Swiss-Prot record:
Coiled coil: none annotated. It is an enzyme of class 4 (lyase). The keyword Lipid biosynthesis applies. Belongs to the mevalonate 3,5-bisphosphate decarboxylase family. The lineage of its organism: Archaea, Methanobacteriati, Thermoplasmatota, Thermoplasmata, Thermoplasmatales. This is Mevalonate 3,5-bisphosphate decarboxylase. Pfam families: MVD-like_N. InterPro entries: GHMP_kinase_C_sf, Mev_decarb, MVD-like_N, MVD_Decarboxylase, Ribosomal_Su5_D2-typ_SF, Ribsml_uS5_D2-typ_fold_subgr. Catalyzes the ATP-independent decarboxylation of (R)-mevalonate 3,5-bisphosphate to isopentenyl phosphate. Functions in an alternative mevalonate pathway, only present in extreme acidophiles of the Thermoplasmatales order, which passes through mevalonate 3-phosphate rather than mevalonate 5-phosphate. GO terms for molecular function: carboxy-lyase activity. It comes from the Archaea. One of its GO terms (biological process) is isopentenyl diphosphate biosynthetic process, mevalonate pathway.
Amino acid sequence: MNIMEISKFQSLGDKIRTMLEDHGYLSENNDYEPNPIDGNISISYAYPIKAFEKFLGYYDVENRVAYNPSISMRTDFSYCIAACRYNKNGNEDTVILDGVTDEKYLRKAKFALDYFRKEFRIKGSFDFYIRRYRRYTKAKGLSESSAVAAAVSRALIKNVFGEGPALDDVFVSKYARLVSGSGTRAAHSGISIWLSYPGINLRECAAFRVADDPHDVYYGIFPKYTDIATDSAHSVAVKSIFYASWLEDKYANIKRLIEHNFDIDELLISGENDMLKLNAILFSGGLIIQTGESLRILRAIQDFKKNGDLFFTADTGPSIMVLSRDKSLIEELRQSVEDPYIEGTYNFNRHTRDLNNFTKEANEYFLENKIE
């Protein structure tokens, strides 16, 4: 992308920021004083998100700044619980994910923690014990990484700053961003927007809640798996000859959504349209993220759509989400699609049934791996 295009998107981003502020969606940036305590253990949780206006491609990889803002809703297809321990004299961070050392998340965590330590002048290391709880076995495109990023970030904030700052979702979202861009939005309940664009003040590169959970919208997902990495999609997208025009459309859509106070019916339409455009962008770069199974489901949905207002969307994976104000439409569709299906709800207390066992498990792990 050339300098003139980047300058244009910075200008468009500044206008979006001003609009959000004028409409009362931006909250004040709070500063907190770190108070890390050696051996302190903190625990937090998060649920994943599903995007209406999506993002692909980082303008600033080092600081995890996307080329465009993105909008999503919280879902309950899974959840993540994370425990964090501070080691004042430690030299090496550790990450245990689902019972094993995970090199991918260790690299992401180290990047974020180095950034965090430098910003707040903190020495020492952090140990994370993380577990994901899924309502499915194996799938791609259900935003697990967003829940992991948000849970880890909130546990870290609680450990270093205390309970109060850990309740500041905007503050938490800034550091979730460093693990996963979508993690910014998973730091919030309801519907949220991640304000991100070229040249943004990094203090404001965070997510902001813009609406409650849309309880009058029914939703669910057909989980499907592919081994395509999200990072591959990011790198392919920015090379597409259609990428800049896609971004222009997104800025125009987001401007309209702000003007209409993030009307849920418009968000449903945006989610479907943007999913199709995202797949076209990746296809133009030679990356096909849908599978034969997901294409069959999409065809069935398209054939069924003439029966009423049923919408679909997907992110960087073949798992297809359906949404409607009319639950009977989804139930009728499912009669013609026999694939495994997860019904979404607005029950965001599922984690409580596992919290005690997780806490015991994490404490036992930390006890076995004592701070020297």
